[in-house]
């Protein structure tokens, strides 16, 4: 029996502008399964926030389909499944923390008893009970994010969406915040969707990810799969053409990244020692770098971006050659 994705995005496109259209999202497709801790990663301007605003229906005009737990996000019922924490916290200036949380709890349809239990528990858990009757608009970034998380948990969401949740947080607060989200993911089977460009902080939490770059999806799936596919050795020499010929003669698959003029080769453990000895014995080039690549999200991300840029260059060359041939 197939499992319905908690998030399913099909052929999403989003443009801005009236006379001159600026296409931000280009045929975006990805899915998140129930209970996953999912990282949505990309550099600033890649389209992360635009995608999230389409998911939560902040943007109404976009092309094609978004489903939340099998329900179109244009259907009001889909809103009961999700909670959202924006990158920047904005609070009414006239409400204190107690008033703000009780108001949002009522709007979420919770009973006063449920609101009291949740507010009391989470204020104590986050050690901010002393801020109950102070205005969150005046809090530090970390304290504001804690209040937003308490608010987001009123409706017991199946999916928690967070846009750059740890931006401007100190390391201690950042770890505390992410640890709580991970606990909710494991204990409540709540799917967590985190947009970030700080990859190191997601390393210990996420089990799946989507990589977006210049409005296009480069990867969507389990981290263990992409880690396996991108594991290898980084190789840089003083004569790339000679190295390329030697690798072909050895029948060793490689990827070449012209932006940095280096190579990635995938080797089995038993191959690596023999390969290294023969590599350093070659007279036609000098080895500058021969280093094993780790399976960190940063290395995975770098490899995907380098491959994307290489493909773009190759595509541009092919188009130019076709034009010249006409």
Swiss-Prot record:
Keyword match Membrane: no
Keyword Nucleotide-binding included in the entry's annotation: yes
A Pfam family reported for this protein in Swiss-Prot or TrEMBL: ABC_tran
Annotated keywords: ATP-binding, Nucleotide-binding, Transport
GO molecular function, one term: ATP binding
Binding site for ATP: 42-49
SUPFAM superfamilies hit by this protein: P-loop containing nucleoside triphosphate hydrolases (SSF52540)
Domain ABC transporter positions: 7-239
Alphabetized InterPro entries for the sequence: AAA+_ATPase (IPR003593), ABC_transporter-like_ATP-bd (IPR003439), ABC_transporter-like_CS (IPR017871), ABC_Transporter_VariousFunc (IPR051782), P-loop_NTPase (IPR027417)
Family: Belongs to the ABC transporter superfamily.
PANTHER family reported in the protein's UniProt record: ABC TRANSPORTER ATP-BINDING PROTEIN ALBC-RELATED (PTHR42939:SF1)
Protein name: Putative ABC transporter ATP-binding protein MPN_334
């Amino acid at each position: 029996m197939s499992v319905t994705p908690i998030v399913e995005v099909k052929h999403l496109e989003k443009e801005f502008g009236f006379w001159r259209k600026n296409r931000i999202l280009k045929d975006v497709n990805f899915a998140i399964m129930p209970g996953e801790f999912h990282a949505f990663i990309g550099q600033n301007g890649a389209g992360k926030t635009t995608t999230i605003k389409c998911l939560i229906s902040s943007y109404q005009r976009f092309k094609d389909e978004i489903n939340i737990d099998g329900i179109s996000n244009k259907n009001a019922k889909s809103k009961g499944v999700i909670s959202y924490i924006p990158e920047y916290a904005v609070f009414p200036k006239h409400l204190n923390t107690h008033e703000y949380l009780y108001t949002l709890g009522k709007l979420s349809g919770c009973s006063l008893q449920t609101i009291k239990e949740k507010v009391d528990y989470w204020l104590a858990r986050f050690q901010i009970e002393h801020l109950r009757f102070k205005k969150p608009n005046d809090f530090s970034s970390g304290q504001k994010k804690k209040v937003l998380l308490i608010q987001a948990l009123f409706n017991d969401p199946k999916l928690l969406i967070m846009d750059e949740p740890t931006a401007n947080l100190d390391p201690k607060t950042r770890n505390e915040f992410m640890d709580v989200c991970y606990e909710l993911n494991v204990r409540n089977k709540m799917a967590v969707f985190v947009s970030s460009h700080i990859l190191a902080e997601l390393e210990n939490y996420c089990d799946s990810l989507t990589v977006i770059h210049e409005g296009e999806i480069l990867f969507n799936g389990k981290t263990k799969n992409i880690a396996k596919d991108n594991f290898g050795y980084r190789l840089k020499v003083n004569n790339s053409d000679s190295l390329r010929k030697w690798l072909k003669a050895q029948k060793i698959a490689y990827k070449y990244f012209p932006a940095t003029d280096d190579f990635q080769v995938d080797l089995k453990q038993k191959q690596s020692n023999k390969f290294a000895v023969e590599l350093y014995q070659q007279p036609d080039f000098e080895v500058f770098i021969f280093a094993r690549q780790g399976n960190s999200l940063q290395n995975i991300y770098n490899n995907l971006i380098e491959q994307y840029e290489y493909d773009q260059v190759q595509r541009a060359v092919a188009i130019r050659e076709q034009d010249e041939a006409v």
